[in-house]
């Protein structure tokens, strides 16, 4: 029995509707992904600083003991920011007796990898670091965007490592940044990224151009890096090199790393990047010998939700001793913040909060009063 023309027309229209809906869903999904990444990219607390993860081969008592020590050392480096902290005598003793700091541990199967995962008492470790006059790096840390171009050593073609690529290095970057307690996002690799920056653009390492075309991600820092074979005039031989820059739009750091493998170079870079951030944002005991008080006037705080968000940020800072609401006049909330670092150091830390913006003008009494505007809901 042959179907009627009317039925076929209706079926055709339904099929077209499904195609339209599917296309709309795809667009919405990409938009949502971009929005989610942009929102996530702003400075936020790193919640896993007291957790360590170590890949193991079995679940024996010997392996658990060895992995527990390594996980503890991983957490120590996360909370301090500098691997050399492990050379401290008391830290070495604590690592040997890591069970005193252990809260819980478990084995997790992740694909073909068996992982020992441990949680430690963060406050006890922070107390250990401070007792030894070692730096402490708080939970609120800068976000970064990582543009990485890799050159094929055979055909010399350049390719970008993005979230949408099938690069073998994505998992390595994720694990390396976890190990150091930092956030380093990879570009989505969508149409907008493709129109803004190509692999050759990143390969050139033009920092100002790459930074300006990365605004959509809203990160505190933008990193550009390239990996490829270069000729070393001194040794008259070829070597594998990673060159990079780190910028926040105002300052820039550059360096070159030589290694045997791309994976090894990426791991070295992540360690250097984490060390750089720690040198800027971790707090030394010598800075915390005095108590400082400053008044913060924050405008556009006109709802209870905004007030709570501001208060959460201020109280979560490692340097904060006490926060009090001093006054509320129209949409301006005035807080008195007592901290253990000078005002200029506090301002450096607060620059990570993209919802808090300083006005262009500067107060004469900026040593005791700071003005901010709340941006966001």
Model-derived features with residue positions:
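N-terminal segment of the mature soluble domain
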Residues: 68-90, 146-204, 310-335, 340, ...
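Short, surface-exposed ligand-recognition loops at beta-strand->loop->(often short) alpha-helix junctions
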Residues: 297-306, 339-340
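Bacterial N-terminal signal peptides that target proteins for export
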Residues: 4-28
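Signal peptide-directed extracytoplasmic domains
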Residues: 88-149, 162-164, 168
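Amphipathic beta-strand/beta-sheet edge segments enriched in Tyr/Trp
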Residues: 47-53, 57, 214-267, 368-376
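Bacterial N-terminal signal peptides
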Residues: 26-36
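A short, hydrophobic beta-strand-centered structural micro-motif
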Residues: 99-108, 186-188, 201-234, 350-366
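Short, well-ordered alpha-helical segments
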Residues: 51-94, 209, 261-272, 276, ...
